[in-house]
C-alpha cells in the first residue's frame, strides 16, 4: 500500500549520519546540510558512496543510497556547464528526440526558463523545479517532477545540474542517482 499525503515541505529524505566511529560520517545528504552539521559537531566525514557511483569495491551503507528507486522510467541525462551552453545542448537534443516522435521533457529552474522559450518543440514538457535562490523549492519539487514525467509517458528527460553547495548537494545526489550517474559536461 502507498499512502500519499500530498506535497511535502522539504522534498528530500532525511540526512543520515553514522556516529559509531570517532569521526561522524554522513551516509546520505539531506535537508540538514554538511555545513550545518559541521557547525554543530566539528569534524565530519562523508561516505565515498555519496560522491560517486557505487562499485563492487564499495557499497553505500545508508538506506536509499543503494538503488535507483526514484529514477524516472525515461532515459534521464543531466548536463553540467554554463546555463547558456547547457540550454543550447538540451534544446538541440530535446528537439531531435521530439522531432522523431518521442515524448521528451526538460528540467530547468525559474531563472533559466527564458533560455528555452520559443526554441523548443511545442510538444516538449518543460518543468521548472523552482528558484535557484531558494533551493528548498527545488528540493520540494524533485520527486513530484520525476513522477509527472512518468505519468506523461516521457521517454527522454534532459536536465540541468545544480550547485552542490549546502542543500544543493542533496539535490544533486538524488538527481544523479535518478539519472543513473549519467552526467555530461558541456
Question: Positions of the model-derived regions?
Answer:
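Active-site-adjacent structural elements in enzyme catalytic cores
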Residues: 1-186
Amino acid at each position: 500500500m502507498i499512502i500519499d499525503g500530498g506535497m511535502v515541505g522539504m522534498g528530500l529524505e532525511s540526512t543520515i549520519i553514522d556516529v559509531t566511529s570517532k569521526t561522524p560520517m554522513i551516509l546520505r545528504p539531506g535537508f540538514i546540510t554538511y555545513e550545518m552539521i559541521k557547525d554543530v559537531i566539528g569534524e565530519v566525514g562523508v561516505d565515498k558512496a555519496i560522491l560517486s557511483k557505487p562499485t563492487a569495491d564499495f557499497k553505500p551503507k545508508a538506506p536509499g543510497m543503494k538503488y535507483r528507486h526514484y529514477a524516472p522510467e525515461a532515459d534521464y541525462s543531466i548536463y553540467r556547464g554554463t546555463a547558456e551552453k547547457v540550454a543550447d545542448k538540451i534544446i538541440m537534443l530535446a528537439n531531435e528526440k521530439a522531432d522523431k516522435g518521442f515524448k521528451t521533457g526538460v528540467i530547468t529552474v525559474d531563472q533559466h526558463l527564458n533560455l528555452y522559450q520559443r526554441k523548443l518543440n511545442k510538444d516538449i514538457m518543460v518543468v521548472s523545479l523552482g528558484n535557484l535562490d531558494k533551493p528548498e523549492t527545488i528540493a520540494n519539487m524533485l520527486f513530484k517532477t520525476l513522477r509527472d514525467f512518468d505519468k506523461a509517458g516521457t521517454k527522454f528527460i534532459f536536465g540541468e545540474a545544480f550547485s552542490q553547495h549546502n542543500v544543493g548537494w542533496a539535490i544533486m545526489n538524488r538527481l544523479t542517482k535518478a539519472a543513473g550517474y549519467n552526467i555530461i559536461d558541456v
